[in-house]
Regions:
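Sec-dependent bacterial lipoprotein signal peptides
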Residues: 1-22
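Conserved functional micro-motifs across diverse proteins
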Residues: 22-162
Length: 162
């Protein structure tokens, strides 16, 4: 009887020790990169599919929402990855048009691999070309970003204004 109690206490202590050690390691892994965490919350992905073939993929992180004190109050700023099937020219491909609430005027900054944000991209497509895109702020309550192609259709992503 006493041997059984000692055995159960020993097993219980081992399990408690094992679980507590795992929890600390797991928390350290999860909370290492706060830029990644914040960015992941405001990252959305959509694609253009035509006849069961993916023609383009865009993943967008709304930077103003993820880091409100870091970004320009005059612009809505986005980290955008664009992958276009066949010849991946990103936004240089004139067959695809990027817009926000029908506005096609924006500032485009190519994101190079040595840029500080590059290593914190929440959902990284290795085939995409990345940009920081700035649209001038207006009175809009929602931000509807659209990548469109005349033949293949549209990919839409909608954010609430921050």
């Amino acid at each position: 009887m006493i041997k059984n109690i000692i055995k159960y206490v020993g097993i219980s202590l081992f399990v408690v020790f094992f679980i507590s050690a795992c929890a600390k390691k797991t928390l350290n892994i999860i909370s290492k990169d706060s830029l990644y965490e914040k960015g992941l919350e405001y990252t959305l992905i959509n694609d253009i599919v035509y006849k069961n073939d993916t023609k383009a993929i865009m993943n967008i992180t709304y930077l103003n929402a993820s880091e409100p004190n870091e970004y320009d109050y005059k612009y809505h700023e986005f980290l955008i990855g664009i992958y276009i099937d066949d010849i991946n020219e990103g936004l240089q491909n004139k067959q695809y048009i990027l817009s926000m609430n029908s506005n096609t005027k924006y500032i485009q900054i190519p994101l190079k691999k040595d840029h500080p944000l590059y290593n914190h991209i929440p959902v990284k497509n290795p085939y995409a070309i990345y940009y920081i895109i700035k649209f001038k702020k207006g009175l809009e309550k929602t931000l509807s970003l659209k990548l469109s192609h005349k033949k293949f259709g549209n990919a839409n992503i909608i954010y609430k204004r921050f």
